[in-house]
From Swiss-Prot:
Name of the coding gene: rplF
Lineage per the UniProt record: Bacteria, Pseudomonadati, Pseudomonadota, Betaproteobacteria, Burkholderiales
Entry similarity comment: Belongs to the universal ribosomal protein uL6 family.
Task of the protein: This protein binds to the 23S rRNA, and is important in its secondary structure. It is located near the subunit interface in the base of the L7/L12 stalk, and near the tRNA binding site of the peptidyltransferase center.
Source organism per UniProt: Ralstonia nicotianae (strain ATCC BAA-1114 / GMI1000) (Ralstonia solanacearum)
Keywords assigned by UniProt, alphabetized: Ribonucleoprotein, Ribosomal protein, RNA-binding, rRNA-binding
Name the UniProt record assigns to this protein: Large ribosomal subunit protein uL6
């Protein structure tokens, strides 16, 4: 059995869970998220906890138990506290600003890059070189952060580009004659 899957999920105050028709819905102060639960995994909701168990003894069922538990735990955390990713812009003239709900990036191209935010994800720019992406869906927040970073990933010689706040860029040495 999966060690991750065995641990029950404690529901914090303000979070409601509903399981019907193979869909698990989590409601909280930051929104509602829904996840389809695989038929090889059984879900039991009681006394403010969610417990997962494999439907049979196959390896696939054991693997899916841990996966489903991790996905639902992220949903519970997302609708109660939310997720955020911080990005920093490193480079002369690199700036970020909000244009309505969209993120406007000046990354050294001849044009500005405008990134539309998907539903449920918000961006903040506390300074011109910092971007904070927030949302209740961990997958969406990470995807948007990866897309923004992908416009100008850190280059290996000077480190200029868009990077995650905790990312260490290993710089290469330039060629010497």
């Amino acid at each position: 059995m999966s060690r991750v899957g065995k641990a029950p999920i404690a529901l914090p105050k303000g979070a409601e869970v509903n399981f019907a028709g193979g869909l698990l819905t989590v409601k909280g102060p930051l929104g509602t998220l829904t996840q389809a639960i695989h038929n090889l995994v059984k879900v039991v909701i009681d006394n403010g906890t969610i417990t997962f168990s494999p439907a049979d003894e196959s390896r696939e069922a054991n693997a899916l138990q841990g996966t489903m538990r991790a996905l639902v735990a992220n949903m519970v955390k997302g609708v109660t506290t939310g997720f955020e990713r911080k990005l920093t812009l490193v480079g002369v003239g690199y700036r970020a600003s909000l244009q309505g709900a969209a993120l406007k990036l000046q990354l050294g191209f001849s044009h500005d890059v405008i990134h539309e935010m998907p539903e449920g994800v918000k961006a903040e720019t506390p300074t011109q070189t910092e971007i904070i992406i927030k949302g209740s869906d961990k997958q969406k927040v990470g995807q948007v952060a990866a897309e923004v970073r992908g416009y100008r990933p850190p280059e290996p010689y000077k480190g200029k580009g868009v990077r995650y706040a905790n990312e260490r860029v290993i710089l290469k040495e330039t060629k010497k004659k």
